[in-house]
Amino acid sequence: MKMLQGRLPLTVLHLFLLLGGGMTQQRPQGPIKDINGLPAQGPTVSVRPGPDPSDKVTFQDCPVDIFFVLDTSESVALRVKPFKTLVTQVKEFTKKFIDKLTSRYYRCDRNLVWNAGALHYSDEVILINSLTRDMKTLRDNVETVEYIGKGTHTDCAIKRGIEEVLIGGSHQKENKYLIVVTDGHPLEGYKEPCGGLEDAANEAKHLGIKVFSVAISPNHLEPRLSVIASDASHRRNFTATSAVGLTDDEIDNTIDTIIDMIKENAEQGCCTYECKPSRGLSGPSGPPGYEGEIGKPGLPGDRGLPGDPGRQGDIGPVGYQGMKGDQGIRGEKGGRGAKGSKGDKGKRGIDGVDGQKGEDGYNGLPGCKGSPGFDGAPGSSGPKGDPGPYGTKGEKGVPGTPGTGGRPGNTGNTGDKGDPGSNGLAGEKGESGDEGDAGADGSPGKRGEAGELGPPGVSGGRGARGEKGEPGPPGDQGRDGPAGPFGDPGEAGPQGPKGYRGDEGPRGPEGPKGPRGAKGLPGEQGIAGERGDDGRPGNGTDGFPGFQGYPGSRGDPGSNGTKGYPGPKGDEGEQGEPGDDNVSPGPPGPKGAKGYRGPEGPPGPPGPGGPPGPDECEILDIIKRMCSCCECTCGPLDLLFVLDSSESIGLSNFQISKDFILKVIDRLSRDEHVKFDADNSHVGVVQYSHGQTQEVVAMGDSSIQSIGQLKEAVKNLKWIAGGTWTGEALAFTKDNLLKRFTLEKKIALVLTDGHSDILRDKTPLNTLCEVTPVVSVGVGDIFQNAPNSDQLVQISCGGKPYSKGLSLQRTSFAELLDDGFLHNVTSHMCSDRKCPDYTCPITYEGPADITMLVDSSTRVGNQHFQTSKSFVKLLAERFLKAKPPPSGSARVSVVQYSGQNQQIVEAQFLTNYTVLEVPVDNMQFINGATNVVSALRAVTELYREDSLAGVNKKLLVFSDGNTQEEKGLLKVVQDAQSAGIEIYVLAVGSRLNYPNLQVMLTGSAADIAGPFPEERLFRVPDYTSLLQGVRYQSISRRIALKSSQ
């Protein structure tokens, strides 16, 4: 219809020129000028002089307002390296578009001209240029655009563009366009401040502004771009960037397609039937045409003039109500009115129809573990058992308590929607409108001269079928029609799931007595009862005695009777003759009864001393193995989280980041026994995006006094969705959070995608390095870009000598919640745990020279000798790595011995364990006799030659007391004592020579020596036990103590 309206004026004009006759086509003589004396724009027509020679025309402009809305947010500026690449491509796209905005002449004698403007936006809107026809200035201003790089408020930008084209644009309201170039992010997560994207798009539609949406690829959000576009024809997968492999020709084709659509729509708007350009000069007469076809019947003529009024007639009878008259003839169209003034802003339009159902969202995170379910339904009945024996009838049971009411079952699924009802009855036809007033009589036109009949025209061929036109804009919402009858009820929905088993209901009333059952089978015979009591004697009198019976038959012989009882004791006999003499004693008599308890005797002498009980080292080891309080602790510490809340993180990833923080806190509390409260460890969280957007929640805030309140505050953090200024956020943490946390041990964890805008944010990324260790965790962003490892290394103080930081990377945010990763993070935070000191440390009260005399004889054997070497190394390490004495040092010697003159000094008074370890490892088993006397003599000589004066001299002898030469043992021990040597003995095994051990420990003969000095004798059951437990700690600590001599 619009196409017909646009061409109708041209058809009428051509017909009028043909009928006018006498027209000739002339070439313009020189440049044609408009009424102001300026050269006319566009094609011109010269007309033969008529009644008014000055009637020269100009072509009216057909203005089109086009406004560019350019996205320069973080998701565009920082998505592709090098940064600003996509912003540069967007600017190039806009400049190419501007270059192609050239004027065009329409056949309705109107000239298309462009008014163009632009803005760019992020979380703020910056006007590049208002609407102008100066394309060069607009192009230059676009070239100077610098990206904002923060959040994305597309709704605000579109509404600002609407404002610009309405206020600064032309009066041609149907020729207003917005070109929105964006990636569509973010999809969700925060309240858009200007009413939302759909609200902005609907406002543009209601105001007749057509919106094209052009994608910034890759990873654009197509659903959001479809919402922005006025309809599908204004989207068409338009793309402004070459990051997805598009060529320049393909981008140029996008621009040409949009411009062609605008020009075609503008022609329909400018070239309508209302277009009445001034009449041009008559052209030359054309050749006579062929005779035309017989015309169709003409339209009804105008109504004639009313006749003169007749005379007054007689009053007739009252008539019946007449039928409603036919509709009056439509009056002629009035002339074009003057241009109206701009109207007031219209009221808010009606709400648009509901949009289609959105795509399914991403799967939610696994929920928390549910509460225990209700008891399951009872199992199916088992097979019927064999009938048992009939029991005795039981007593009547106690009436049960009424049960509570059962829980209602779950509501079943809603049934399918019923079929729509049939259409309602059509409403009554409305009454015709009142008859219109008659139009003014037109002046009769002059009768034209009849033209010559032309020959019949040749029938034209059938034209090609026209292409289907674009769908028209949606019409206004119709008024609600009458409600139809209710539809038939829908089919019953599928049966709902079986509800949970309800609780046992109350006991019902006793039912009626059932019919008597069939006679049961006979039961098994019962066990015979006990004999009943004798009955009471009868009441009758004694009967008379009966007659004597006949004698019975002879019975069988009886059995032998039992032995009779002994008879009475006889009289005492006469004394017998004396027997022969017997020199052997008789047997001893029986033991007498136990006598009475005698008086308490005097106390006995003291018994020998028992073996020594566990010493301090052994007690500490027992405590360590039995007591949970001996575990190492991580705290107290101050824990700082710095959380990236920028747009490139995405809402779902931001939620995972908060869950990660909460899980780290929980693991530190549970596994590392960190206690978070005001007097122990503290936690603080800083979330950030671009400049001045930091937000901190920490223990110690007025509303956060416990770890539970802090967790709740972390859960309530809202996604900022702006730029990424990590350096500024770290400086904010240093200035605002670290000042509040004053514990010596602290650590910061920075969670980011590693894409900080270092072009805008000049704060160094290693700001926290000098004040606290930093763990940087980098995770890929929503565009699947890997984190920037260089930035992560800077954040975690990589390459600094004082650094205790750690840099970790993950592909996706879901990996943050993996148990293994959480364990690694918390283990690093607690790498320097504070553990109780159960090593039983050595304490020297003065300088000491310690010698270990190792048995290398056949009695020991090579395998046990190797065990002795390992034990010697443990002792030596303890002696030499302990805290040195206040003055001087501790020195250690190692000597092995066997037979006569078989003593080897392996290490002589060394102070460095590393140096001593090598000769001990190289010790070779001698495998000779056992001569302790010769060994003690050699060691005494060693002390006299190399030991320092004023030091404590200690000697540990590996011996079980057995020696080939016992005669000189006492003397060499006394010589050693006189040299100031204190002797300790390590005795292994059960075959010990205690007399010799007593001589070695006391320096006295075995028969006159006092009790064993147990503090200097170390008994070990076997060589394997040497390396078990804390025996080496006990022995070394006891040797290192001050001498007891």
From Swiss-Prot:
Origin species: Xenopus laevis
Residue ranges occupied by any VWFA domain in the UniProt entry: 65-255, 638-825, 849-1035
* Entry similarity comment: Belongs to the type VI collagen family.
Compositionally biased intervals (Low complexity): 297-309, 375-392
What SMART domains does UniProt report for this protein, alphabetically? VWA
Q: Where is this motif: Cell attachment site?
A: 501-503, 554-556
Protein name, per record: Collagen alpha-1(VI) chain
Give the residue range of the signal peptide.
Answer: 1-24
Biological role: Collagen VI acts as a cell-binding protein.
Supply one GO BP term: cell adhesion
Q: Which GO terms describe its cellular component?
A: collagen trimer; extracellular space
The record's annotation in InterPro entries points to: Collagen, ECM_Assembly_Org, VWF_A, vWFA_dom_sf
